[in-house]
Amino acid sequence: DRKIRPMLDHPLIEYVGEVDEAQKVVLLKNAKALLNTIDWPEPFGLVMIEALACGTPVIVRGCGSAPEVITHGKTGFICASKLDFIHAIHDVDKLSRKTCREEFERRFSADTMVSNYEELYYRLLQKNSFPEATGSKEAQRSFGLMQLSRASVFR
């Protein structure tokens, strides 16, 4: 609080506090970019994906899932230093908001995610990747249910 509060008095900073989902979408859609400076290995990066869904480029450190979510120079910039962040902020207008949204649709939409999960489950079933059930009749029946065809499981 001692470090952050004084910075909020800057004329270029507007502290909006906690927001609901609708307000978050409005903020992301109207943002020039999402500046995500976390320096821990975030495993998924939902906030980056939410920004892309709004067509907003992301400027981020290259740790955690960032390199998997953001395509450097296309949907944002992956930065290693303060100087990289400065250049990225300066260059963010060169990125296409339409491309950010299209990349979200191609990689992270609900339809895409469902399709990817279906394909993964199908491959696992085809490879018989589950260990053979041994022991009780109930365990053997459960294993048999996992062997269903893709059509009966996913359609």
Roles of regions detected by a PLM:
Residues 36-47, 67-68:
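Nucleotide-sugar-dependent
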Residues 20-31, 53, 71:
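Short acidic alpha-helix that forms the nucleotide-activated donor recognition element
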Residues 2-26:
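Nucleotide-activated donor-binding/catalytic signature segment of Leloir-type glycosyltransferases, i.e.
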Residues 62-73, 77-79:
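Short acidic/histidine- and often glycine-rich active-site loop of Leloir-type glycosyltransferases
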Residues 94-110, 116-119:
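A short, well-ordered alpha-helix in the C-terminal region of glycosyltransferases
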Residues 42-45, 52, 62:
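Short glycine/acidic-rich beta->alpha loop that forms part of the nucleotide-sugar donor binding site
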Residues 77-99:
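C-terminal "capping" alpha-helix adjacent to the active site of nucleotide-linked donor transferases
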Residues 57-60:
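Short hydrophobic beta-strand element within catalytic cores of glycosyltransferases
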